Regions:
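Catalytic strand-loop segment that frames the active site of acyl-thioester-processing enzymes
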Residues: 1-47
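Generic detection of short hydrophobic beta-strand segments and adjacent strand-loop junctions
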Residues: 8-14, 77, 125-127
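Short amphipathic alpha-helical segments
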Residues: 20, 55-56
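Secondary-structure boundary/capping positions in well-ordered alpha/beta enzyme cores
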Residues: 29, 68-69, 118
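Hydrophobic beta-strand-centered segment that forms part of the acyl-chain substrate-binding groove
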Residues: 42-46, 56-95
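Short, conserved phosphate/pyrophosphate- and ester-handling motifs at nucleotide-, phospho-/glycolipid
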Residues: 51
Length: 133
């Protein structure tokens, strides 16, 4: 069983293919994500990844950090900076609360741009951890 303060970081590089597949699966073809000519005309100057694509990395990181048979009970997210295609993101999970008797954990979730440390997505997740074996 992990203790409060336990933290793990994962590195993920966002690719154009990831953004395209996310658009296809969700139907979110907002041109800021998939149309480079349109994106050049925006304040960002280039395509940005879907915020929820980055949020989805938290789900993967929670499984890798706390075990594959745990259950995701909730997640809140704030999108604080754009993530661009080609950015490498550091996805960090930190256990900040734990109800051991119920195996319920509260996890701080943060996605930072590796190149400059900008926090791009942050929030908290509540998970039911897998029982120890």
């Amino acid at each position: 069983m992990h203790e409060i303060g336990y933290s793990k970081t994962y590195e993920i590089t966002v690719t154009k293919d990831m953004v395209q597949k996310y658009a296809e699966v969700t139907g979110d073809f907002n041109p800021i994500h998939v149309d480079e000519d349109f994106a050049k005309s925006t304040k960002f100057g280039k395509c940005i990844a879907h915020g929820m694509l980055i949020g989805g990395f938290f789900s993967r990181a929670l499984v890798d950090t706390f075990g594959g048979s745990g259950i995701y009970l909730g997640q809140d997210l704030k999108f604080t900076n754009p993530v661009f295609v080609g950015d490498t993101i550091l996805v960090q999970m930190t256990l900040i609360g734990l109800r051991k008797e119920k195996l319920i954990g509260t996890v701080e979730t943060t996605a930072k741009r590796k190149s400059n440390g900008d926090v791009c997505v942050k929030g908290q997740a509540v998970i039911m951890m897998a029982p120890p074996r």
